[in-house]
Curated annotation (Swiss-Prot):
GO molecular function: 2 iron, 2 sulfur cluster binding; 4 iron, 4 sulfur cluster binding; biotin synthase activity; iron ion binding
Protein name, as recorded: Biotin synthase
Signal peptide extent: none
4Fe-4S is among the record's keywords: yes
Cofactor: [4Fe-4S] cluster; [2Fe-2S] cluster
Organism whose genome encodes this protein: Picosynechococcus sp. (strain ATCC 27264 / PCC 7002 / PR-6)
Upper classification of the organism: Bacteria, Bacillati, Cyanobacteriota, Cyanophyceae, Oscillatoriophycideae
């Protein structure tokens, strides 16, 4: 079992130059936002300066500037996707946040083998009816890269992907762990255009939460996917005990890898896991994470993912004014989400529309 100490809220690093106060802060942030809209990209030092912004009032100003970047670089379409847990529990890996690990099975994690194609397709149709444009097949385990040559599960998943394309209009995605270049090509040929494989944390912090595989193992899979022409969906979890430097480094690593979609999960501690007694993030700390990710990743699809309801509660709508332009709707892997109708109503109240958001470069090219 990974022994992860419970850490206090990350301390904000001291800025190299003072952050403006009062009304000057809003103008300063808008200037930075305009720089980014015009094509500049923040350095690590500049991004760390943003982490020195504290207090609800100032964080909301940071969010407003991030929302300006989102509006100008991505538009008003909120990317909607849904997932299905196609194989659950008894995972070989020891990710300290996950209740599916065989090293520390969570109290609420179901255990079952690969679902049938019929079960998965039924859920794909339900996701499509709820407004999702993409549907991701998620499986436990380190990856199909390590499957036995006699294992037919990968072929079953490929066939299910083909059937989803034939029987629905929703786009199939996968999250099956590590893949070889050859497997990535097979997924592409079957019709998978986007694949989720989260980095989860910075390279520096990763060994504190996982020891059964490395951060570089995850990077290798992302590179294999992109080489096969598959879009990379990769993000992380906020609230593991990481520092602000770790958060900034994760965002910059995702930028360097040119990922298209970035899920931001907010830790919802699960009993039975090493992080089960962690506190949930403060709402304003979560908003600050979202806004800073948008400053670093101006054109990426940044997605509200796991923990949205648990951490944000009745303030979920603020994330959609803090740089977020995508949502995972419906249920999560081992926990329940709120009804999709509630999400659609929230979007409408904010003047946003659900659909399929542009990937980096698409929105600006269309203007």
């Amino acid at each position: 079992m990974v022994q992860v100490p419970i850490k206090p809220t990350p301390q904000t690093p001291a800025p190299t130059t003072a952050i403006p106060n009062g009304p000057a802060l809003e103008a300063w942030l808008n200037d930075w936002a305009q720089r980014i809209i015009n094509g500049d990209r923040l350095t690590r030092t500049e991004a760390l300066r943003l982490t020195a912004i504290t207090g609800p009032e100032n964080i909301l100003k940071l969010c407003a500037a991030a929302d300006l970047i989102r509006h100008e670089c991505c538009g008003n379409t909120v990317d909607l996707c849904s997932i299905v847990n196609v194989k659950s529990g008894s995972c070989s890996e020891n990710c300290s946040f996950c209740s599916q690990s065989a090293h520390h099975p969570g109290e609420d994690s179901p255990v079952y083998g690969l679902k049938t194609a019929e079960e998965i397709i039924e859920q794909a149709k339900a996701a499509e009816a709820a407004g999702a444009k993409r549907f991701c097949l998620v499986s436990q385990g380190r990856g199909i890269k390590y499957n036995s040559p006699r294992d037919t599960e990968f072929e079953q998943i490929l066939e299910t992907v083909r059937r989803i394309q034939a029987e629905t209009a929703i786009k199939p995605c996968c999250a099956l762990g590590e893949v070889t270049p050859e497997q990535a090509q097979q997924l592409r040929e079957a019709g998978v255009t986007r694949y989720n494989h989260n980095l989860e944390a910075s390279e520096n912090f990763f060994p504190d939460i996982v020891t059964t595989h490395s951060w570089q193992d995850r990077v290798e899979t992302i590179k294999n996917l992109k080489a096969a022409g598959i879009q990379a969906c990769s993000g992380g979890i906020m609230g593991l005990g990481e520092s602000w430097e770790d958060r900034v480094d994760l965002a910059i690593a995702l930028r360097d890898l040119e990922v298209e979609s970035v899920p931001l999960n907010l830790l919802n501690p699960r009993q039975g896991t090493p992080l089960g007694s962690n506190d949930r993030l403060d709402v304003y700390e979560a908003l600050k994470c979202m806004a800073i990710f948008r400053f670093i990743l101006p054109e990426q699809i940044i997605r509200y993912a796991g923990g949205r309801e648990a951490v944000m509660g009745e303030l979920q709508h603020l994330g959609l004014k803090a740089g977020i332009n995508a949502m995972l709707i419906g249920h999560y892997l081992t926990t329940m989400g709120q009804p999709p109708e509630q999400d659609q109503a929230m979007l409408k109240s904010l003047g946003l529309q659900g659909g399929e958001a542009p990937i980096p470069g698409q929105y600006s090219a269309a203007q």
